[in-house]
């Protein structure tokens, strides 16, 4: 998801997106531990997306 698109969303939608990303990150970590993950860069990309969403949520709260 694009940062511009994230900035246009309200906080409740961002929280839902954050929950989805956290679940996805957990699943990717489990796949990585069991050697089923083909592309390990997905972990980093998901982690970065989580950080972006958290940052935007915090900016909207202030």
From Swiss-Prot:
Pfam families: Ribosomal_L29. InterPro entries: Ribosomal_uL29 (IPR001854), Ribosomal_uL29_sf (IPR036049). GO terms for cellular component: ribonucleoprotein complex; ribosome. Keywords: Ribonucleoprotein, Ribosomal protein. One of its GO terms (biological process) is translation. GO terms for molecular function: structural constituent of ribosome. SUPFAM superfamilies: Ribosomal protein L29 (L29p). NCBIfam families: L29 (TIGR00012). Belongs to the universal ribosomal protein uL29 family. This is Large ribosomal subunit protein uL29.
